[in-house]
């Protein structure tokens, strides 16, 4: 059975790319709104050539009777300003990192490729296109997990939107 999941979604939300980028790059703050994963910054690099680079550890809590998963990933962010257009691309993929080797009782998943593309369509509105290609190394119960996984991108956008609304009120 193929365990690789291709998950995708798109949405338009009434918040600026600047706010979304700030929230999506605040790795520890993501725990406040992304209920699926626990996030930790392993390493953050100085901006180089307009690219921001971060190494993150994600811990994914699974239902009872299933082993939890984790992923170490590199995240890169590009921003582009062309006149009135503002775009942002966030790409993540799995890597190995000496500070976070695989653990016993936690299965190391693989983020084959994850991408979020943000495109400003009007002042204060952003189109979000999101795609994840992930292998969580599931052997049993894969059908159930796959059903749940298909809902995750939409939940991610909903939680992000709620958090933006909360931040915007501040």
Predicted stretch roles:
Residues 1-170:
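Eukaryotic helix-grip
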